[in-house]
Structures are given as C-alpha cells and as structure tokens.
Amino acid sequence: MSQRQFKVIIIGGSVTGLTLAHSLHKIGIDYVVLEKRDTVTPQEGASIGILPNGARILDQLGLYEAIEDEAPPLGATRIHFPDGFAFTSLYPKKILENFGYPIAFLERRQLLRILYDALPDKTRIHVNKTMSTIEHFTKDEITGARVLTKEGDVYEGDLIVGADGIHSQTRGEIWRRINSSKSEFEPAECIDKCILIEYSCCFGISKCVTGLIAGEQVMHMRNGRTLVVIPSKDEVVFWFLVEKLDRKYTYSEAPRFTIDDATALCSQVFTLPIGNGIKFEDVWNKREVVNMLSLEESCLSTWSTGRLVCIGDSIHKVSIPS
C-alpha cells in the first residue's frame, strides 16, 4: 500500500500564506490555500517594504527578480525634524553594501500578484472560502485535520496553518482548544492582554506625481507623528502618516477610522515639503486610494496545538514605529 502524501491546508492567501505555498512546492509537499475574499490581490491602498532578510528568502524561491522589476531600491532618505533641522542619510545604500539586498517598496497588491502568478499550480488556490470549523479526525487508522467552510466545502489534510493575519480565526480555534483541554499546555492568552494598539496609520498611493526621484525617501519626524513619502517608478508615490493615539487601546476597543478621519489627519501636514517645490498636499491631491487603520502590536507565546499552527501577523505583528 502506498503511503499517503502529507498535505498542508493554508488558511489565508496573504503574503505569508502564498510564500509558504511556494516553499512547500519547492520541497514537494502537497497543499491548498483557502482565501475568504474573492481575490488574492485586493487593492487596499497599501505598500509593502522588502528588506534584506525577506529579499533573501524570496530570492531562494526564485521570486526576487520579478520584484526587482517593480520596486526601485531606496538610495537616500531625507529626514526632517520639528526644529527645522534636516539631513540626508545614505543608510539604504549601506544596507545594500552590508547585506547584498536593498530596501525596496512596491504595492502590496503587486507583491501578491507576483507570488500568485509564479505558482505552478493555481488550482490549489481557492477563493471565496471562509473557514467555519476545524476538526481532527481518524479515518482508516489515519489521523488528520479537516477544515469546513461556510460555503459548504470540506478540505482534509495533515496540518492546518493559519496565515490569516491579525484577526486570525485559526488563532481563535487554537486558543479555544487549549482552554478546553486538560493537557499541560499553558492557558491561552487573553487577546486583550496580548494585542495592543498605540498608533494609527493613514496610508495611500498617489499617481502622476511629477518632480520626485524614484528611490529617494522623505521623512518628517514630528512630536507623536511621522510622515513617510516614498517615490517609486512611473511617477507613483507610496506614503503613510503614523500618529500616536491618545492612549493605548486593547484589541477589542481598537479605534476605527473613516475617510473623513484620514482627510482631517492628512490636512494637518499638507504644508510639509517633499522636494523640488512639492508639498504633501500635492501628493494628497493625486491620491488613487487611501486607507486608515489602527496598528496592532503583538508577540504571542502560544503558536500551535495539535495539528494547528499560526504564522505571520496572526501571532507576531510589529507596527511601523517599532
């Protein structure tokens, strides 16, 4: 009798989830990816920075060349302080010299598209699949785990990996099982003690912004507030404005923001200079998409139980100020 092939069920078509899919493919392990949205490349207005540690992994997976084509490397950073002092730092070039890879930014959606397009077998990626229940089972003396979806589908495998982000359902299932178990595991953490919010971030993508040089980042450091503007190729500009909140919030009381909140916050930095006579208001006026979110921070001690494990933001998330 042939041995059954080990199979991994990945919850979440995130950057983490799709990168894991590539890793499993490289070593010949069967897998499926379940994504609750109708696409693995949603437009959320977010950019993503690729640092040398991540670039090295993506290069090993054969993905980095496609990223290089989309993301010009940072070469210099112009940093402004509240007292008017400003200087140009070449730390991005030093990072390239020291580690062999640069810092580079691209649209998060572009990175997801690169990860998805490079997968050899796209039939393993299932969208519109929302996890409902996770079960352990024994069948014909073989044990495993299955995922039931709200859409009525059933997926069976040997390991379930939660790559479903800070609002992870997989993490919730792990904690539920640990709390109901009589094993010697430590009690699962209270989510409000482990996931805290001290900052908000308004972020966006602007297009057709002329006069800025790709790869020359601009930062304005203010008391409790930081604006970062990153010109990219084809007159695209990534930017984000981080603000310290009035207090530290728990996960359950995380502030929610509207487009009016984003506009009100960004209008306070309209006059800040970006370069070549351009002010942030000019970048704002060319915006294509804008979003504003609370920035969660966490580092959880319970990552797994049984055949369930969480990775990425679901168990370890740092905010931009960190």
UniProtKB/Swiss-Prot annotation:
Taxonomic classification: Eukaryota, Fungi, Dikarya, Ascomycota, Pezizomycotina
The protein, known as: FAD-dependent monooxygenase subE
Keywords, sorted A to Z: FAD, Flavoprotein, Monooxygenase, Oxidoreductase
GO BP field: terpenoid biosynthetic process
Leading EC class: oxidoreductase
Expression induction: The subglutinol cluster is highly expressed when mycelia and hyphae are transferred to fresh media for a 3 hour induction period, remaining expressed under conditions of heat shock. The cluster is repressed in cultures reaching stationary phase or in early germinating cultures, as well as under conditions of UV, salt and oxidative stress.
Keyword Transcription in record: no
Pathway(s) per entry: Secondary metabolite biosynthesis; terpenoid biosynthesis
Function (record text): FAD-dependent monooxygenase; part of the gene cluster that mediates the biosynthesis of the immunosuppressants subglutinols, meroterpenoids consisting of an alpha-pyrone (4-hydroxy-5,6-dimethyl-2-pyrone) moiety attached to a decalin core fused to a five-membered cyclic ether carrying a prenylside chain. The first step of the pathway is the synthesis of the alpha-pyrone moiety by the polyketide synthase subA via condensation of one acetyl-CoA starter unit with 3 malonyl-CoA units and 2 methylations.
Enzyme Commission designation: 1.-.-.-
Family: Belongs to the paxM FAD-dependent monooxygenase family.
Organism for this UniProt entry: Metarhizium robertsii (strain ARSEF 23 / ATCC MYA-3075) (Metarhizium anisopliae (strain ARSEF 23))
